[in-house]
Design a protein with these regions (language model features):
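Active-site-proximal cap/loop segments of hydrolase catalytic domains
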Residues: 519-737
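Asp-box/WD-like beta-propeller blade repeats and closely related beta-sheet repeat scaffolds
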Residues: 123-211
Length: 737
């Protein structure tokens, strides 16, 4: 964002600021959480050590290319919360320094064009502050000003290139009603009223929807002075798309005249059964909107080229299939019109993610999971693709967030992690791919931990294919001794066991407790081409289960492997429940977190119906006609989608799928099992875990149920996370050691 702040923009607003608050931030605020000074005993990683790591995120390069602004969250177990503050580091990795020490989290921090001030979100509003001592050892924010006054709150924001306008995300009421909507005096009544699907999503009842607004700085950032991008629509859509999308779904054109955005313009049943989001071009002057005509599935993350003559975005071809191949699409943009739409990754085997234009507007950097690790790639506008980072480096790279040029030399700035260390910033040579870590946020903790060892093993499947299986060995591993082991059952089901770092399913932590951790990339994983990924749809109980058993039996044949557990979450929980009925004494205990137990009930109680509809029916029986609407109650079509994966479908794959639900095999359960679930899990509702536990009890199987009433599909509160880990390892140790 190079350029001058124009009159009437952000600079002018500082003269007539909405609200001027504290003048400086060089002191520590009440509620501040700083870096942990934990001391590790005997080099053994513990759950407490895992929660002590600082979590680095959202790096932003300054306009002059010299300084990176980023955030780090620290956790207080005692306070049961985390707090995110801002940091700086020179782009070459020198002089890391802390910028804020606030007691309230700061998010969405962005450089202003002058390179001397930043804007950010805190307490649901946008703030601006100058950076004092930018290049010094103790920088701070001074002259803080609240520059928005949106009573509904602000989630994220994005400046226009000249900073005269801002996009921001706030909320509007939805079609899900509460008693107060009909009678304000019923302020103590609690109920939700819905007359269509999508009344709840992920972890919340959908009583409000995100909308994106445009505000002119000269008029003040208030709801009254803002334009809702979706104001002209006849129905209540969401922008950005729930539950995880943000302003990466919207992008300003370089001249500020247009906004490209991604939106699923569907509601209710149509929304629940479709993944069809489209890319729209919004004219900020006229309010008119045009769509890039793609159809099909997800179209997301539009990004203008620096010269404004092209747009790229990510795209899936098929509606209703959330694990379709992710293509990197491009289109020319001339005189307000889109033309020459093309797939830059037509000959690329893997899923593209995180595109970033080179400043020459001729090439795009992106990342992709490829053969078990996530690397950085480069595509030119003609679709020629090269790999930047080496597949021999066992790390997962996020997509670059900035490109630095020095003559013919190109340096990419990105972040990376592995199963051995959490996210850190890294610089990548654009030609050689050589990488150099430029932050060391958690070195003081990692240096205290005893090292593990890792193996990439190719396991033969029952049909003779090679399956990448990561194996992590405990510190001081001795092949003459016998160790307990854990088989990891991946969620998704379409995902990948790559070199990622997790704060719950942390394999280094598991290995540190003395376990050999076995991680098969079974059928359905996404880093090995679309055929390997798509095989699992309609075959949950089939080849991928045999893949798990093949990996388990190969490892158990090793003299150093003793007892073995199978553990997994979400679809991994389904796998655990299914294996419990077919494993023939391969495993000594099971742990299922947020798993699917009964497929028929799952179809009727989850929220994103497209997932079950596709995967339960398989690809061959899937059918969709754009605009098709079935009559209510015909049991076959809703919202334009044929119910090919429903329990009442008459296709062969759906019938087989439901016949092989884990709940059908409970009479064969004979192995101790721990069932864990969150009470606010609306993806796989908590009664699935309760039913599995109840059935285990009725079968006389040693079993335990742990229910977190305030957690969703993930366990996020620090004390709950600590308890989760303690119970997890207590169960493993009880039955495997």
């Amino acid at each position: 964002m190079k350029g001058t702040i124009k009159p009437g923009g952000l600079a002018a607003l500082t003269i007539s600021a909405l609200l001027t608050m504290n003048c400086t931030s060089d002191k520590t605020s009440e509620g501040y959480i700083g870096p942990s000074q934990i001391e590790i005993k005997d080099g053994k990683m513990t759950p407490e050590a895992l929660l002590a790591f600082g979590r680095l995120s959202d790096p932003q390069l300054s306009p002059d290319g010299k300084t990176i602004l980023y955030g780090i969250s620290y956790t207080s177990i005692a306070d049961n919360r985390s707090c995110r503050n801002l940091f700086l580091v020179n782009a070459d990795g020198t002089s890391p320094r802390q910028l804020t020490r606030d007691g309230k989290s700061i998010s969405c921090a962005r450089w202003c064009n002058d390179g001397k001030s930043v804007a950010y979100v805190q307490g649901g509003q946008i703030w601006k502050a100058d950076v004092r001592g930018l290049s010094g050892e103790k920088p701070s924010l001074v002259r803080r000003q609240q520059i928005s006054d949106v009573k509904e709150g602000v989630g994220e924001f994005k400046f226009s290139p000249d900073e005269s306008k801002v996009l921001y995300v706030s909320y509007v009421h939805s079609n899900v009603k509460t008693p107060k909507d009909s009678d304000p005096s019923l302020d103590k009544a609690s109920a939700y009223v819905a007359e269509d699907l999508m009344y709840r999503h992920w972890d919340h009842w959908v009583t409000e929807l995100p909308h994106t607004f445009i505000a002119d700085f000269s008029k003040g950032i208030t709801r009254e002075n803002s334009t809702d991008i979706l104001a002209g629509e006849s129905k209540l859509y969401e922008l950005p798309t729930e539950p995880f999308s943000g302003l990466e779904q919207l992008d300003w054109s370089p001249d500020g005249k247009y906004i490209a955005y991604s939106c699923k313009k569907k509601t209710g049943k149509e929304y629940a059964f479709s993944t069809n989001t489209e890319i729209y071009i919004y004219d900020t002057g006229t309010g008119e909107c045009q769509v890039i005509p793609m159809g099909g599935g997800y179209d997301t993350n539009p990004l203008w080229s620096p010269d404004g003559k092209a747009i790229v975005w990510l795209s899936m071809a098929r509606d209703g299939y959330e694990a379709d191949k992710v293509r990197l699409m491009a289109a020319d943009f001339t005189d307000g019109s889109v033309s020459n739409i093309r797939d830059l990754t037509a000959d690329f085997k893997y899923n593209a993610a995180g595109p970033l234009w080179d400043e020459d507007s001729r090439s795009i950097y992106f990342n992709a999971l490829a053969e078990g690790v996530q690397g950085v790639f480069k595509a030119d506008i003609d679709g020629n693709i090269s790999r930047i980072t080496s597949p021999d480096v066992w790390c997962d790279y996020d997509s670059p967030f900035a490109v630095l040029k020095d003559g013919d030399n190109t340096t990419l700035l990105a972040s990376w992690c592995s199963m051995d260390f959490p996210t850190e910033l890294v610089s990548i040579d654009g030609k050689s791919g050589e990488s150099r870590q430029i932050t060391d946020e958690n070195g003081h903790i990692l240096s205290q931990l005893a090292p593990d060892t890792m193996e990439a093993r190719m396991v033969k499947t029952v049909d003779g294919k090679d399956m990448l299986t990561w194996v992590m060995y405990p510190p001081q591993f001795d092949s003459t001794k016998v160790y307990p082991s854990i088989l990891i059952c991946l969620g998704g089901p379409q995902g990948t066991l790559s070199q990622s770092w997790s704060y719950r399913w942390n394999y280094r932590l598991m290995a540190a407790q003395g376990y050999v951790v076995v991680m098969p990339n079974r059928r359905g994983t996404t880093a090995f081409g679309q055929d390997w990924c798509e095989q699992i749809s309609g075959d949950y109980s089939g080849l991928n289960i045999q893949d798990y058993l093949a990996a388990a039996r190969e490892l158990k044949a090793e003299p150093y492997i003793g007892k073995m557990a199978a553990c997994g979450a979400s679809y991994g929980g389904y796998s655990v429940y299914y294996l419990a009925g077919v494993h023939e004494n391969t495993f000594d205990c099971f742990i299922a977190h947020a798993g699917i137990f009964d497929e028929k009930y799952m179809y009727g109680e989850t929220e994103e119906m497209w997932f079950c509809n596709w995967d339960n029916g398989g690809l061959e029986e899937y059918s969709y006609t754009p605009g098709q609407m079935g009559p209510a109650g015909d049991g076959k079509t809703f919202g334009g989608m044929v119910q090919g994966g429903s329990p009442w479908s008459d296709n062969a794959k759906a019938k087989r799928h439901y016949a092989h639900s884990p709940s059908e095999n409970v009479t064969k359960w004979n192995t101790p099992i721990l069932c864990i679930h969150g009470g606010m899990d609306f993806r796989i509702p908590y009664d699935q875990g309760m039913a599995a536990f109840n059935c285990a009890q009725m079968m006389g199987v040693p079993s335990k149920l742990i229910m977190f009433p305030e957690e969703c599909h993930w366990i996020l509160q620090p004390q709950n996370a600590l308890f989760w880990h303690r119970e997890y390892f207590d169960w493993l140790d009880r039955w495997c050691k």
